[in-house]
């Protein structure tokens, strides 16, 4: 589908899936912290889950549901347009977002496991190597590309001539 309302709802539904996944990560973290000296997760697993929770909440839920999903649904309506200026780019942006989620989840199953670098990926922690980190960084890059396309489409819709957008 290339209708902005459907794509906005797809963004929001997928972002809420990411929210539920981050909630599972949060439950794992809370289970580990429930009692002192708990051996539910190893230190490395705890850091991996913490990284996945933070990055999923920030990159895959808050930004996508709050800005992109809501924006796709509302921006053309606020401008009086039938659709966004580039509807196929809008659809591609959603599928790139979904692909980024799949890449991020796949990172857990590669040698070295999921990244345990924290959601900020700052230097002392981000010096970790392994295929999992590479896949997670590829997911973040794909997500950034998706966001760039989606937001450029919003700008193009806003700047479109009146007869082109309506």
Annotated model-derived regions:
Residues 1-166:
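...captures the hydrophobic TM-helix bundle architecture rather than a specific catalytic motif
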């Amino acid at each position: 589908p290339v209708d902005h309302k459907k794509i906005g709802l797809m963004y929001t539904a997928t972002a809420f899936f990411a929210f539920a996944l981050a909630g599972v990560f949060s439950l794992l973290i809370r289970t580990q912290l429930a009692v002192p000296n708990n051996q539910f997760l190893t230190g490395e697993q705890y850091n991996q889950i913490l990284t996945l929770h933070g990055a999923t909440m920030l990159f895959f839920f808050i930004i996508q549901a709050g800005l992109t999903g809501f924006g796709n649904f509302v921006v053309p309506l606020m401008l009086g347009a039938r659709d966004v200026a580039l509807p196929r780019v809008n659809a591609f942006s959603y599928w790139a977002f979904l692909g980024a989620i799949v890449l991020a989840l796949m990172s857990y199953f590669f040698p070295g496991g999921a990244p345990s670098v924290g959601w900020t990926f700052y230097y002392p922690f981000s010096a970790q190597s392994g295929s999992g980190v590479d896949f997670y960084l590829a997911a973040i890059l794909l997500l950034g590309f998706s966001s760039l396309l989606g937001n450029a489409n919003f700008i193009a819709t806003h700047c479109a001539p009146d007869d082109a957008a309506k």
